[in-house]
From Swiss-Prot:
The keyword Metal-binding applies. PANTHER family: FOSFOMYCIN RESISTANCE PROTEIN FOSX, LYASE, PUTATIVE-RELATED-RELATED. The gene is fosX. Its main location: cytoplasm. This is Fosfomycin resistance protein FosX. Homodimer. Gene3D superfamilies: 2,3-Dihydroxybiphenyl 1,2-Dioxygenase, domain 1. InterPro entries: Fosfomycin_Res_Enzymes (IPR051332), FosX (IPR037434), Glyas_Bleomycin-R_OHBP_Dase (IPR029068), Glyas_Fos-R_dOase_dom (IPR004360), VOC (IPR037523). Belongs to the fosfomycin resistance protein family. Residues 4-122 form the VOC domain. The lineage of its organism: Bacteria, Pseudomonadati, Pseudomonadota, Alphaproteobacteria, Hyphomicrobiales. It is found in: Cytoplasm.
Amino acid sequence: MIEGLSHMTFIVRDLERMTRILEGVFDAREVYASDTEQFSLSREKFFLIGDIWVAIMQGEKLAERSYNHIAFKIDDADFDRYAERVGKLGLDMRPPRPRVEGEGRSIYFYDDDNHMFELHTGTLTERLARKAKGLEAAQ
């Protein structure tokens, strides 16, 4: 039986740059760095973002960008503060996609290795309620 999400791993060219991104945007806390010891495929670091285990490993960046992404929940009151954090790190912030009212707001950005991240103010419950409301209006 699946118990939950174990971890996420991102392959990055520059471990130190990604460390600055994780700490600067997500308030990640570094809990392990392989440094010169290598027990895995390559040098790696582990972080906690809240209770989520995030691993980064040194390697080649993604060849191209896509809409595949990881979304982290943020409070709407913190939206502007997070947008400022992303901007200060010089990350490629993308325009938000069109949404209907009630679905929350999002900050989309790419890291230097073509991974897309989203900082989102909404929840699944809110999204489903909004979609149900839209279906009712259409009937």
